[in-house]
From Swiss-Prot:
It holds the Pfam family AA_permease. Activated by N-ethylmaleimide (NEM). Inhibited by furosemide, DIDS and bumetanide. The inhibition is much stronger in the presence of 50 mM K(+) in the uptake medium. Inhibited by DIOA. Inhibited by WNK3. Residues 12-27 have a biased composition (Basic and acidic residues). It comes from Mus musculus. The chain crosses the membrane at residues 120-142, 150-172, 197-225, 250-271, 272-300, 420-440, 451-473, 505-531, 555-573, 574-598, 613-635, 636-651. GO terms for biological process: cellular response to glucose stimulus; chloride transmembrane transport; potassium ion import across plasma membrane; potassium ion transmembrane transport. This is Solute carrier family 12 member 7.
């Protein structure tokens, strides 16, 4: 019986002794007076108000007044004295977030309230007893015994009670693992399994509690309309066939009225519900005692309760008083009222029903007593279809052929089809309610002792009551009476009430108030559970239900609960509502067992339950039994409940706030990750499994914000959530000075990764210089077999500016590091022009310029990009370069065949490059590059002059490039080069720098370009011209990236070559293979 919320007012209090405790409650630094209205710390995660050592707020002077602990003075800010910590622990009250005051605070002043703490018997045992015993025991248990028989009924009850006992053992382990927060099973599950499981199971538990309220209200109305006041029915059946529909309509009307009345009572004040709790409990106890007293009485004085049978069929004793066809009156024989029900007249010659005419009417005792031997007749099941006759086994009957069942005949018929699994679903709600003690944990003297003891004792007691009642019902009551759900054969009396002593009204009135009180407590507890979930903030759309009245009463949650409860009342059938809430409670219990099993198997250091009588096998058995019972009850209800829980889980995972509750699922994930990492090969992957595992190198500005966020957009387009992505960056400085900036930078990167939907890991390094930091990232990023094989970085656009934090020297060194590590390198040039994830290219080309083969990565990257919606409509074109002595036609055929085997569709074009003379532009471009390099080395320029000189040379190179096609004259000699330096300025520099010899400037004017540089520049210029001619309008151009020179003296020239190679192109991706990445033609 799942009334899992018996609400008791929780007052702020101080557990102190004597005057010292009273004084502590008045001091502002006491544990009770710490502001608990804002349970959300700086990380945004609500925490339980617990005595964590970093939350102790006491003035530093009080720690070391005598200077005895001056040695530890520096640690006092974060680590308190042991005496202070123990004081906090001793005065800790386990009031957690989500716990609200259930009674109005008549005066708003904070004062000490010495509320009596409850022990095991009052605080746990009796509430569990009250919540477990209830409506199913009074209204359906006799019917279950009649349909399933004693043996199968015993099996049903044993399975359900075993399930709850195993769940109680798991719950006891969880509840005794530390101070128990008030809040019940939701807090235990959510803090053990994490916010996703906690929210999903919490909502299922809430729905179960809400539908439980509907079930109790329906039970209350059924008792009222069937056994207390049948004349109060609004809808009357015109025929016997319409009685069931009329009853359902009456249940809907009266149930809705009862729900509205109960909701008003709960809204006005829950204190009235709490005051009536003892009355409801007394009703339950008296009813149970009356049942046992009635059983004992049947042993020596069975009650006289006749049941009329026609043949072997049970008759509904409503419109006749004599169980006979005819009776003798004044020496004459006359027909009875029963005759007139089956015949068309009262005369002996009237036409009667064929079955009535051929079978005799007999009368048996409905409750023959314990000593009657009826137990053997009730031992086995008697399942039947809907509308079947309730027949007594072993009684002879004359069958009739092709009998039609005319309406109006007073037979007792079954209203629903009965079978084993259906009875399990109807019965299971009667064993729920084991969480009542944990919901009162905030008001217990010793919750870690009371919850296991009280809960397990309550389950043992109720299991004994249920099992003994099954045996006693089977031994005392006739089978046809047991199968008579509504007591029609007993003139409409409650079957279990007829057994009770001293009067049937003890059971009728007791069960009425018991179910009424259970409904009130469900409507009290369910809104508070929803309010606790809403206040946790894990489900954003439920946050409105976290608000309530000024005193904390959950008004909006109560309104939603009443609406959901109304849907259950509109179903109107107790037998249809019971399996629904069975699903939700079974799911809740399943995850309680899962939480205990996971924590035990992981052996986490904080898993130290005080309750020792648990084992992971018991929890696993309980979880399996819950899952089995779900599908036994109703496989489609089970799938629907699991679908709801799964949707809630994914919603919380997708939209919910990030919570860190130290849950077991995180530990399980870590164990699974460790196991998977140990299985991953440390060597290179197989050819067929190779994919780029990317380390993205980001640059940060002075505010620790990402300079080029579109680099992450490009990463998500390239990876599409598959494989490994590590986003790294370097901060210059020492870790002691920069750890705050490092944390802020990591938060900025993570938020940008989330915005760009880049799934991966963030790794930030603080190093004395950027060069070493980048090298450390390339060497150490990743773990075990999960290491990157590709480095993605942005081209340093302003590399010619000497004060650029990521200078060209760092860039070239990073290129060398990736080459040494045999890793691929991707350099995105003009990264700010790359598309964001929201953009779409409706047309265009991705051009691949395949100059040298370094593993086939150039062809793999466009294929991966085109899987993303941004690049999906772009065509792929592959260009390769042919020299004069190459057969370009055969090259094109071979390349097309190669792509065919690679299963890549792309246009192929072979571009011929004629070896002509080195142009004047190339010679001058090389000269400008070398002159600039020499000048910057030889002249000690100021920062502003150096920048201006670099810009002037850059401008002249650009102007030279625009007029290169019109030049036909021979390469200019060095003396024709126009320099911005005058002779006077050079003399002034010479006097300023005495150590600079005059030969340096003389060499500057007689400089001749190096022939290898001229050849490289010639290649760059020629290739750039060819690429511009073919791919200037391409959406993306992929090019082989030349390797850096072996000598570091040519690093700056290398940067200039790359600049010339890619000049004039919008989006360029320079690709340098590491030698290990491959693309294969094999499957």
């Amino acid at each position: 019986m799942p009334t899992n919320f018996t609400v008791v007012p929780v007052e702020a209090r101080a557990d102190g002794a004597g005057d010292e405790a009273a004084e502590r409650t008045e001091e502002p630094e006491s544990p009770e007076s710490v502001d608990q209205t804002s349970p959300t710390p700086g990380d945004g995660n609500p925490r339980e108000n617990s005595p964590f050592i970093n939350n102790v707020e006491v003035e530093r002077e009080s720690y070391f007044e005598g200077k005895n602990m001056a040695l530890f003075e520096e640690e006092m800010d974060s680590n308190p004295m042991v005496s202070s910590l123990l004081n906090k622990l001793a005065n800790y009250t386990n009031l957690s977030q989500g716990v609200v005051e259930h009674e109005e605070d008549e005066d708003s002043r904070r004062r000490e309230v010495k509320a009596p703490r409850m022990g095991t018997f009052i605080g746990v045992y009796l509430p569990c007893l009250q919540n477990i015993l209830g409506v199913i025991l009074f209204l359906r248990l006799t019917w279950i015994v009649g349909a399933a028989g004693v043996m199968e009924s015993f099996l049903i009850v044993a399975m359900c009670c075993t399930c709850t006992m195993l769940t109680a053992i798991s719950m006891s382990a969880i509840a005794t693992n530390g101070v128990v927060p008030a809040g019940g099973s939701y807090y235990m599950i959510s803090r053990s399994l994490g916010p996703e499981f906690g929210g999903a199971v919490g909502l299922c538990f809430y729905l179960g509690t809400t539908f439980a309220g509907a079930m109790y209200i329906l039970g209350t109305i059924e008792i009222f309309l069937t056994y207390i006041s049948p004349s109060a029915a609004i809808f009357q059946a015109e025929t016997a066939d319409g009685e069931a529909a009329a009853l359902l309509n009456n249940m809907r009307v009266y149930g809705s009225c009862a729900l509205a009345l109960m909701a008003v009572v709960v809204f006005v004040g829950v204190k009235y519900v709490n005051k009536l709790a003892l009355v409801f409990l007394a009703c339950v106890v008296l009813s149970i005692l009356a049942i046992y007293a009635g059983v004992i009485k049947t042993a020596f004085a069975p009650p006289d309760i006749p049941v009329c049978l026609l043949g072997n069929r049970t008759l509904a004793n409503r419109n006749f008083d004599t169980c006979a066809k005819m009776q003798v009156v004044s020496n004459g024989t006359v027909t009875t009222a029963l005759w007139r029900l089956f015949c068309n007249g009262s005369s002996l010659g009237a036409t009667c029903d064929e079955y009535f005419a051929q079978n005799n009417v007999t009368e048996i005792q409905g409750i023959p007593g314990v000593a009657s031997g009826v137990f053997l007749d009730n031992l086995w099941s008697t399942y039947s279809d809907k509308g079947a006759f309730v027949e007594k086994k072993g009684v002879s009957s004359v069958p009739v052929s092709e009998e039609s069942r005319p309406g109006g005949l007073p037979y007792v018929l079954t209203d629903i089809m009965t079978y084993f699994t259906m009875l399990v679903g109807i019965y299971f709600p009667s064993v729920t309610g084991i969480m009542a003690g944990s919901n009162r944990s905030g008001d217990l003297k010793d919750a870690q002792k009371s919850i296991p003891t009280g809960t397990i004792l309550a389950i043992v007691t109720t299991s004994f009551i249920y099992l003994s009642c099954i045996v006693l019902f089977g031994a005392c009551i006739e089978g046809v009476v047991l199968r008579d759900k509504f007591g029609e054969a007993l003139q409409g009396n409650l079957v279990i009430g007829m057994l009770a002593w001293p009067s049937p009204w003890v059971i009728v009135i007791g069960s009425f108030f018991s179910t009424c009180g259970a409904g009130l407590q469900s409507l009290t507890g369910a809104p508070r559970l929803l309010q606790a979930i809403a206040r946790d903030g894990i489900i954003p759309f439920l946050q409105v239900f976290g608000h309530g009245k000024a005193n904390g009463e959950p008004t909006w949650a109560l309104l939603l609960t009443a609406l959901i409860c109304e849907t259950g009342i509109l179903i109107a059938s107790l037998d249809s509502v019971a399996p629904i809430l069975s699903m939700f409670f079974l799911m809740c219990y399943m995850f309680v067992n899962l939480a205990c099993a996971v924590q035990t198997l992981l052996r986490t250091p904080n898993w130290r339950p005080r309750f020792k009588f648990y084992h992971w096998t018991l929890s696993f058995l309980g979880m399996s039994l819950c899952l089995a019972l779900m599908f036994i009850c109703s496989w489609y209800y089970a799938l629907f409940a699991m679908l709801i829980a799964g949707c809630i889980y994914k919603y919380i995972e997708y939209r919910g706030a990030e919570k860190e509750w130290g849950d077991g699922i995180r530990g399980l994930s870590l164990n699974a990750a460790r196991y998977a990492l140990l299985r991953v090969e440390h060597g290179p992957p197989h050819t067929k499994n190779w994919r780029p595992q990317v380390l993205v190198m980001l640059n940060l500005d002075s505010e620790q914000c990402v300079k080029h966020p579109r680099l992450l957009s490009f990463t998500s387009q390239l990876k599409a959530g598959k494989g490994l992505t590590i986003v790294g960056s370097v901060l210059e400085g020492t870790y002691l000075d920069k750890h705050v900036e490092a944390q802020r930078a990591e938060e900025n990167i993570r938020s940008l990764m989330s915005a760009e939907k880049t799934k991966g890991f963030c790794q930030l390094v603080v190093s004395s210089n950027l060069r070493d930091g980048a090298s450390h990232l390339i060497q150490s990023a990743g773990l075990g077999g999960m290491k990157h094989n590709t480095v993605l970085m942005a081209w340093p656009e302003a590399w010619k500016e000497a004060d650029n934090p990521f200078s060209w020297k760092n860039f070239v060194d990073t290129v060398r590091d990736t080459t040494a590590a045999h890793q691929a390198l991707l350099v995105a040039k003009n990264i700010d022009l790359f598309p964001q994830n929201q953009e779409r290219f409706s047309d265009g080309n991705i051009d691949v310029w395949w100059i040298v083969h370094d593993g086939g990565m150039l062809m793999l990257l466009p294929f991966l990009l085109r899987q993303h919606k941004v690049w999906r409509k772009c065509r792929m074109r592959i260009f390769t370069v042919a020299q004069v002595d190459d057969n370009s036609i055969q090259m094109k055929k071979d390349l097309q065949m190669f792509l065919y085997h690679l299963r890549i569709s792309a246009e192929v074009e072979v571009v011929e490059m004629v070896e002509n003379d080195i142009s004047a532009f190339t010679y001058e471009k090389t000269l400008m590059m070398e002159q600039r390099s020499q000048m910057l080395k030889q002249m000690q320029l100021s920062k502003n002059e150096r920048e201006r000189e670099a810009q002037l040379i850059h401008d002249r190179n650009t102007a030279s490039h625009t007029t290169a096609t019109a030049r036909t004259q021979a390469p200019p000699t060095p003396d024709k080069v126009q320099m911005t330096w005058t002779k006077e300025k050079l003399i002034a520099e010479k006097h300023r720098n005495k150590d600079t010899g005059p030969s340096g400037f003389k060499d500057l004017f007689s400089l001749k370009p190096d022939q290898s540089n001229v050849r490289r520049m010639h290649t760059a210029v020629k290739l750039n011209g060819v690429v511009l001619n073919k791919s200037q309008d391409a959406q993306l151009v992929l090019l082989n990236m030349p390797g850096p020179p072996k000598s570091r003296q040519g690093d700056e020239n290398y940067m200039e070559f790359l600049e010339v190679l890619t000049e004039g192109l919008n989006r360029v991706l320079l690709v340098r293979g590491g030698g290990r990445e491959v693309i294969t033609i094999y499957s």
